[in-house]
Amino acid sequence: MATLIDNRYGKARVRVLRVFKGPNEYHKVFDFDCRVLLRGAEFSETYLTGDNSKVVATDTMKNTVYVIAQKEEFKSLEEYGILLGKHFLATYSWVNGVEVVMRENQWRRIKTSNGKEQAHSFQRDREIHSVTVTSSRDKSPVVVSGIDDLLIMKTTQSGFEGFHRDKYTSLKETKDRVFATVVTANWTYNTLSVDYSKVFEQFKLSVFDIFAQTYSRSVQETLFLIAKDVISKVPQVEQVHLSLPNKHAFGFDFSRLNIENNQTVFQPVEEPSGLIEGTIKRSHSRL
């Protein structure tokens, strides 16, 4: 005997560039990759018997992504994901759940020699804005925002001392080292009344403030302080998950060449690398 215990299906890698055109050719762009997955008990028939009568074609789903993008007004991809999930639930009564996953390329306005940001010319940043919106019938949508590929580095104000040592330990303690990492993070909300774009920018500010302005005794400490700062400054954020790989840059060994090492030349090492992760949740006081 074989039993189908779960199923979902949809369309992936739907590429969208949405341009909102305001007065005086002031444009706002959303450049993103979208994946839509549908759930529903009645979809089991297509797996078990080949009956496709309830199957919403993935081509239909792809077209819907573009139609809703043009039809609806939205200020963030989080809002767009909520609208898209609402559409599928309202249109197809047998759909019980919708998951919309998006990865947005970040474009900032070009600043020209006159010091002004241009209304419709953009330069792409490295980091990615990630969004997952899960919509279920008779429940509020669950929104998870995130960031990927935010590469940061500082060349001092970081150390690593006092760690456990045993017979397999070769790492030397240091009060001063290069600290580089690629920030991957996501966060959940305790409400849907959120300025999602503002929260995204605040998250980056918290990363920059903690990373640049505090001495790091460990990647773990820096991770916690970033999440703590976000939670303290954004009351709508309920939980933060961070992943920080330690992108090592070791001092080059000049001793082999009988040259003094003045700690200004380093050798970046891509792998292996440390990987530090943590999830921090808002504490609620008990009365």
From Swiss-Prot:
EC annotation from Swiss-Prot or TrEMBL: 1.7.3.3
Location in the cell: Peroxisome
Motif (Microbody targeting signal): 285-287
Pfam families per record: Uricase (PF01014)
One example GO MF annotation: urate oxidase activity
GO BP terms in the entry: purine nucleobase catabolic process; urate catabolic process
Chief subcellular location: other
Recorded catalytic activity of this chain's protein: urate + O2 + H2O = 5-hydroxyisourate + H2O2
Record: residues binding urate: 58-59, 160, 177, 219-220, 246
UniProt keyword terms in alphabetical order: Oxidoreductase, Peroxisome, Purine metabolism
Cellular-component GO terms for this entry: peroxisome; phagocytic vesicle
Record: active site: 11, 58, 248
Known pathway: Purine metabolism; urate degradation; (S)-allantoin from urate: step 1/3
Function: Catalyzes the oxidation of uric acid to 5-hydroxyisourate, which is further processed to form (S)-allantoin.
Similarity annotation: Belongs to the uricase family.
Name of the featured protein: Uricase
